[in-house]
């Protein structure tokens, strides 16, 4: 097999580096095509050409050759080449422009059978345009009006137009080009809106993941099957469209081969007019086909439909919806008089209007659930990071909504310029009052009234002792959690004894530890000396990385498959050994080519062999010994040229490390991978495929496999080892492949045994009990603890006239009516992400924050919990829900997208709690004033006994006991 399968001659590594380097800085342009490449392959290519200045070691070595582009690690299904969910840019894949892709493809080729992963650049944002590559296409459900139960799943780019969808649907449902059609957007089970603007993009139309679209062909008599429904329900004109002058179907649309049964069907009775949504982006008609709603739905108990990974948005919205002062403000239409359409920092009032419309729907008492489609569309226009359908952070969205509502509703029309002032020894009360008044001169809205408090920040210079005190507003408290110090890892230990299966262990290691810590922990459980272990990352049947003992464990992500190999101590005779990576490959004939291909399979091995006086025969015996467990017995006599019994020791850890050191000092340019030297001895080595024999030697026997010297990925051959009459000279950077033909592998290789492993008792034993739950007060104390600024984040001291690593301390000066507490559960580095699942115990009633407020003249700050945003799962994946207290009946409910169920207080405190909403007790609290009359309620609402008793409870101070 040649080194890659590119169609053009490959230039030298310096030229490759220069040409690709210039292209990788290409700016994203709307409509341009970019390609995804598995980051592991791309990193290997960068090492090969010395792309990064800090990684120039062994540039151009054959052993680093990346081979053909291989994206198999990105697919959840190799056959359909469906992308895995939640892939992360730079971590899992890299994006390259078309010209860069074409060069790499010409130089290296692509793994046979793989199609390029090409995606469009789409533009987001209304005022500030933001381009990004649309990695995940939008899945739409398509059906024909006459048969709504047969739904086809089809993928489109958000840059595709409505006309593109219509043309694709004509093709799928065999609708003649001359027959007129109408396209309907079906959502909320039985609500339909007509898509009339053919030039609108999918993004403009606000279509979301899993959206159902219905195509309606015109009847032969010129009428429409839905004409009666439309005439009864819609006052807006509709626009029928034909097929003339339509653009061709998008190359980015692809249809799933499977039919998906959909139980929803059109109900022709009980229609009512739902009106046309504000900013409907081309929806010219809208109507519902559902039964009249029940008059007994409790206002506020309205679920939110998941539009495709939008549970994070639903969770945040449910918490805000159940924030009484804010919801009352919108339901009373107080926002209409305060919309600031001219604020350059605002969104022309459109976020406020979209939010108001959604809140009115949720509190109308008419619907059990609604789809926040138009609100999401508006958010995506102003905040492109939320425009897609990947999982996002509910707290980040919450911060955007609060900031957006504030700017849209800011009562200040012209913000004055105010010079920031330092305390300069003045009393805190004076400086704080000045800071708050200045803040209100520029920021005056219902959000400031409800959510804003004041921090006190103290900086002390370590050199001159200058003290700087400032007061800054905040909208929510982000509280750190005590970081865990340990990490649990699951690894496979591969014993040196070839008869023993790999054993899976669960070990506890320091969170910021080294590979040596992993080996020590594994040694305690296995009894194998840590110095005899080699830790590897196995990926796609090859070694992605072989770790050194001093490397950090942070390089290993939870998704990596870690195999630890036992390497024996130095043999008694003192001979020097080297340890070689060995890959299993199956040789396949390619009808379209005269050269053969090879496919990796199975788990790779580390095999130790003598460094000197190594023959092909002794190498074959060493490998046969190592894989003896995989070989089906009995073997035919023709294969028995050497016994498959374990004999010699399988290697030396000491020489493994020593060889690395030796190779570091070899002179540059010297061949390091495969050399042969003449030997005066009679060697048994030779071409393993030959069956001829020497004149006086024993008859040669058939071999199970042949050897190839390959690159470190196993994807490109460097040399064969057919070296009759010569000794092999290999080194520790050599990589071998043992190549099986398909028939021999099928007959004699035990696939099941090669994949088998045992589980150590550590896998079944309960994990070490985590630290008991921490109290919320511990998080607050951690937040207010003095810290020293890092060397990369210094403070400029006005006295010393230079940057200093000052000490910094936060304190709380004043707290708002609604206190939003963000528990900082997520942490990450460049290699992996982590979530802290620690249970934080927070009071549901009577949270006393007074002791944490440094203004001793302040009012009491006692709060009751009103909502919680929950996150289940790991960072970047998982699911968001919410608990919230309905202010009309005083009961707790659990909101899970469109589902709403009754909950109890003892369910609320869990390890999933992420964002907490507290409402302050005071004379202005809605619980002691006349409640607003909500639509759908009986003119007012009676407070539950629990609410009436709430004001009489004794406030308690948080206690860790």
UniProtKB/Swiss-Prot annotation:
Q: Which residues form the USP domain?
A: 302-921
Q: Where is the composition biased (Polar residues)?
A: 225-243
Q: Where is this motif: Nuclear export signal?
A: 133-141
Composition bias, kind Low complexity: at what positions?
244-257
Share an example GO biological-process annotation for this protein: proteolysis
In which tissues has expression of this protein been reported? Expressed in hippocampus and striatum (at protein level).
Q: Which reaction does it catalyse?
A: Thiol-dependent hydrolysis of ester, thioester, amide, peptide and isopeptide bonds formed by the C-terminal Gly of ubiquitin (a 76-residue protein attached to proteins as an intracellular targeting signal)
Annotated region Necessary for interaction with RB1 and RBL2: the residues are 459-463
Q: Which InterPro entries match?
A: DUSP-like_sf, Papain-like_cys_pep_sf, Pept_C19_DUSP, Peptidase_C19_UCH, Ub_carboxyl-term_hydrolase, Ub_USP-typ, USP_CS, USP_dom
Q: List the subcellular locations.
A: Cytoplasm; Nucleus
Per UniProt, residues of the Ubiquitin-like domain are: 142-226, 483-571
UniProt activity-regulation remark: The completion of the deubiquitinase reaction is mediated by the DUSP and ubiquitin-like 1 domains which promotes the release of ubiquitin from the catalytic site enabling subsequent reactions to occur.
Question: Which top EC class applies here?
Answer: hydrolase
Where on this chain does Zn(2+) bind?
A: 461, 464, 797, 800
Where can the motif Nuclear localization signal be found?
A: 765-770
Q: Where is the composition biased (Acidic residues)?
A: 950-961
Q: Where is the active site?
A: 311, 879
What are the boundaries of the region Interacts with DUSP and ubiquitin-like 1 domains and is required for USP4 activation? Answer: 485-773
- Spans annotated as Required for USP4 activation by providing conformational flexibility between the DUSP and catalytic domains: 229-295
Q: Which domain of life is it from?
A: Eukaryota
Q: Extract the Pfam families matched here.
A: DUSP, Ubiquitin_3, UCH
PANTHER family (alphabetical): UBIQUITIN CARBOXYL-TERMINAL HYDROLASE, UBIQUITIN CARBOXYL-TERMINAL HYDROLASE 4
Function, please? Deubiquitinating enzyme that removes conjugated ubiquitin from target proteins. Deubiquitinates PDPK1. Deubiquitinates TRIM21. Deubiquitinates receptor ADORA2A which increases the amount of functional receptor at the cell surface. Deubiquitinates HAS2. Deubiquitinates RHEB in response to EGF signaling, promoting mTORC1 signaling. May regulate mRNA splicing through deubiquitination of the U4 spliceosomal protein PRPF3. This may prevent its recognition by the U5 component PRPF8 thereby destabilizing interactions within the U4/U6.U5 snRNP.
Question: What is the protein named?
Answer: Ubiquitin carboxyl-terminal hydrolase 4
């Amino acid at each position: 097999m040649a080194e890659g399968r590119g169609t053009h001659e490959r230039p030298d590594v310096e030229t490759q580096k220069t040409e690709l380097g210039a292209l990788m800085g290409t700016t994203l342009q709307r409509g341009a095509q970019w390609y995804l490449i598995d980051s592991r392959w791309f990193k290997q290519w960068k090492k090969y050409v010395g792309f990064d200045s800090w990684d120039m070691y062994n540039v151009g070595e054959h052993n680093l050759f990346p081979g053909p582009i291989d994206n198999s690690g990105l697919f959840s299904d190799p056959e359909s080449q469906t992308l895995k969910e939640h892939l992360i840019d730079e971590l899992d894949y890299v994006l390259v422009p078309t010209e860069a892709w074409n060069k790499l493809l010409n130089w290296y080729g692509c793994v046979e059978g793989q199609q390029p992963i090409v995606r469009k650049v789409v533009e987001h944002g209304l005022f500030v345009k933001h381009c990004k590559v649309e990695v995940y296409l939008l899945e739409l459900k398509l059906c024909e009006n006459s048969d709504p139960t047969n739904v086809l799943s089809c993928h489109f780019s958000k840059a595709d137009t409505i006309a593109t969808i219509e043309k694709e649907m004509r093709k799928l449902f065999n609708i003649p080009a001359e027959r007129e059609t109408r396209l309907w957007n079906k959502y909320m089970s039985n609500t339909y809106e007509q898509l009339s603007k053919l030039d609108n993009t999918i993004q403009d139309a606000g279509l979301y993941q899993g959206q159902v679209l219905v195509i309606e062909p015109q009847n032969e008599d010129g009428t429409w099957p839905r004409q009666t429904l439309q005439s009864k329900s819609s006052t807006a004109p509709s626009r029928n469209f034909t097929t003339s002058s339509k653009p061709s179907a998008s190359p980015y649309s692809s249809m799933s081969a499977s039919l998906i049964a959909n139980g929803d069907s059109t109900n022709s009775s009980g229609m009512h007019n739902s009106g046309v949504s504000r900013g409907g982006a081309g929806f010219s008609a809208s109507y519902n086909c559902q039964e009249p709603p029940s008059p007994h739905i409790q206002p506020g108990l309205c679920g939110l439909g998941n539009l495709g990974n939008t549970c994070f948005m639903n969770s945040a919205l449910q918490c805000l919806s159940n924030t009484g002062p804010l919801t009352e403000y919108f339901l009373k239409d107080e926002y209409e008089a305060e919309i600031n359409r001219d604020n350059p920092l605002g969104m022309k009032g459109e976020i406020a209007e979209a939010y108001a419309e959604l809140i009115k729907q949720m509190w109308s008492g008419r619907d059990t659930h609604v789809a926040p489609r138009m609100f999401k569309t508006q958010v995506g226009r102003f905040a492109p990071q939320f425009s897609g359908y990947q999982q996002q952070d509910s707290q980040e969205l919450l911060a955007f909504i609060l900031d957006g509502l504030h700017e849209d509703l800011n009562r200040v029309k012209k913000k004055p310029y105010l010079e920031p002032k330092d305390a300069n020894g003045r009393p805190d009360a004076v400086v704080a009052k000045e800071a708050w008044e200045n803040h209100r001169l520029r920021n005056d809205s219902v959000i400031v009234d409800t959510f804003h408090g004041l921090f006190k920040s103290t900086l002390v210079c370590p050199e001159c002792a200058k003290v700087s005190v400032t007061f800054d507003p905040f909208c929510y408290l982000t509280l750190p959690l005590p970081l865990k110090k340990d990490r649990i890892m699951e690894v496979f230990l591969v014993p040196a004894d070839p008869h023993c299966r790999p054993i899976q262990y669960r070990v506890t290691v320091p969170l910021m530890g080294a590979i040596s810590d992993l080996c020590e922990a594994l040694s305690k459980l296995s009894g194998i000396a840590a110095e005899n272990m080699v830790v590897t990352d196995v990926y796609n049947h090859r070694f992605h990385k072989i770790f050194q003992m001093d490397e950090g464990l942070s390089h290993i992500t939870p998704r990596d498959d870690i195999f630890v190999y036992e390497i024996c101590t130095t043999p008694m005779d003192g001979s020097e050994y080297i340890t070689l990576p060995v890959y299993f490959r199956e040789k396949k004939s390619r009808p379209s080519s005269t050269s053969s291909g090879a496919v990796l399979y199975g788990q790779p091995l580390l095999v130790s062999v003598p460094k000197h006086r190594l023959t092909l025969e002794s190498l074959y015996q060493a490998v046969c010994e190592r894989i003896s467990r995989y070989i089906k017995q009995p073997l035919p006599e023709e294969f028995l040229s050497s016994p498959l019994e374990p004999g010699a020791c399988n290697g030396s850890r000491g020489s493994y490390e020593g060889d690395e050191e030796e190779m570091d000092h070899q002179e540059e340019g010297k061949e390091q991978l495969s050399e042969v030297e003449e030997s005066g001895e009679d060697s048994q080595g030779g071409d393993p495929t030959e069956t001829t024999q020497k004149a006086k030697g024993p008859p040669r026997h058939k071999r199970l496999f042949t050897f190839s010297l390959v690159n470190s990925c196993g994807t490109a051959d460097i040399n064969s080892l057919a070296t009759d009459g010569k000794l092999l000279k290999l080194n520790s950077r050599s990589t071998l492949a043992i190549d099986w033909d398909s028939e021999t592998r099928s007959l004699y290789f035990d696939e099941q045994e090669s994949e088998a492993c045992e589980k150590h008792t550590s896998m079944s034993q309960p994990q070490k009990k985590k630290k008991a739950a921490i109290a919320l007060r511990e998080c607050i104390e951690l937040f207010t603890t003095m810290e020293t600024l890092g060397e990369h984040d210094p403070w400029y001291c006005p006295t010393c006239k230079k940057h200093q690593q000052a000490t910094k301390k936060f304190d709380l000066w004043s707290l708002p009516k609604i206190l939003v507490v963000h528990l900082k559960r997520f942490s990450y580095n460049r290699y992996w992400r982590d979530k802290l699942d620690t249970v934080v115990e927070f009071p549901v009633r009577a949270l006393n924050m007074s002791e944490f407020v440094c203004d001793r003249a302040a009012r009491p700050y006692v709060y009751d919990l009103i909502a919680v945003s929950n996150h289940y799962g790991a960072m970047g994946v998982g699911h968001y829900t919410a608990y919230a207290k309905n202010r009309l009946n005083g009961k707790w409910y659990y909101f899970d997208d469109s589902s709403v169920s009754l909950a109890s207080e003892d369910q609320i405190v869990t390890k999933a709690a992420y964002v907490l909403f507290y409402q302050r007790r005071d004379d202005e609290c809605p619980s002691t004033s006349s409640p607003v009359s909500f639509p759908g309620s009986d003119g007012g609402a009676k407070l539950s006994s629990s609410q009436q008793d709430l004001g009489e409870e004794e406030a308690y101070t948080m206690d860790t006991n």
